[in-house]
Amino acid sequence: MRSSNLTTTVHFLSPVFAAFFPSHGTEQEDAPIVRVKTAKGRKISSTNWIRRQVNDQYVSLAKKEGYRSRSAYKLIEINDKFKILQRGRFVLDLGSSPGGWAQVASKNTAIIDSTEPTVVAVDIQSMKDIHNVSFVQCDIDSDHDLLNEKLSGRKFDVVLSDMAPKSCGHRQVDHANIINLCELARDIALEYLNPNGSFVTKLLHGEYEQEFRRSIMTHFGVVSYFKPKSSRKDSSEIYLVALKFKG
C-alpha cells in the first residue's frame, strides 16, 4: 500500500496493539466495541452485539458442530467453491486464534494414519490445541526470524489469512488498516507457498484494493473475489482467492 494522507501507519500485530486487534472471526464476534451507556448501564453497541449473536444461525451452528467461531463457515464455503483444501495438502493459517479456520483446514487435509500435522497455525495470541494442527505463537510482523525457525524451511500448498484489525468505524481508515495486514499475509504467502499453491485473504473494498489485487495477479494464475453467504449482511468484507501460484 502506498503512503497516503491517512495518519495510520502502525504495525497492527505488535504486542502493544495485540489487545485491540482480533484474529479470526473479526465481525465483532468476540469483543464488541462499547460506546454509549443505556439507562440500565449496558452499552448500546454491546446490547446490539449480544442480540445479533443470539439471533445468528451460524453462531448457533458453530456451537452445535463444535467450531470455535462462526467464521469457520466462511472457509467451508470458500473451499466448496474453490477446492483449495484437499487430503494431504499442507496449510499455513495466519492469525489463527481462536481456531475456527484451523479446524476446517485440519478436517479437510488430515492424512489418515499419519502423525504429521498438515496445518500450521500462527497467532500472537494463544490458541487451544486442535488435532492435526501445529501451533506457533509469535508476531508474524516482528518475529519473522522466529517464524522461519519454527517452520524449518517447509513449504505449504495453501496460505490462509482471515486477519483484520478491529473496526474503528471510519471506512477509509479501516480499509487502509486491513490492506496493511493483507500485504503482510501476501509477503508470507510468496515466501512459503509451493508452486501452484493457493492464497486466501480477507479485505475491504476501497482505495488500495486494485493496487493490492494487481500485486497478487503478478504471482498467481487465477485471482477471484468471493463473498460467503455466512458473512454478516451488514459486513463489507470480501475474500480474495488466488490460485495457481507462479512463484
UniProtKB/Swiss-Prot annotation:
GO CC annotation terms, alphabetical: cytoplasm
Subcellular location: Cytoplasm
Keyword rRNA processing: yes
MF-aspect GO terms: rRNA (uridine-2'-O-)-methyltransferase activity
Residues reported in the UniProt entry to bind S-adenosyl-L-methionine: G99, W101, D123, D139, D162
Pfam families to which the protein is assigned, alphabetical: FtsJ
EC number(s) stated in the UniProt entry for this protein: 2.1.1.166
InterPro entries: RNA_methyltr_RlmE, RNA_MeTrfase_FtsJ_dom, rRNA-MeTfrase_E, SAM-dependent_MTases_sf
Catalytic-site annotation from UniProt: K202
Function: Specifically methylates the uridine in position 2552 of 23S rRNA at the 2'-O position of the ribose in the fully assembled 50S ribosomal subunit.
Identification of the protein by name: Ribosomal RNA large subunit methyltransferase E
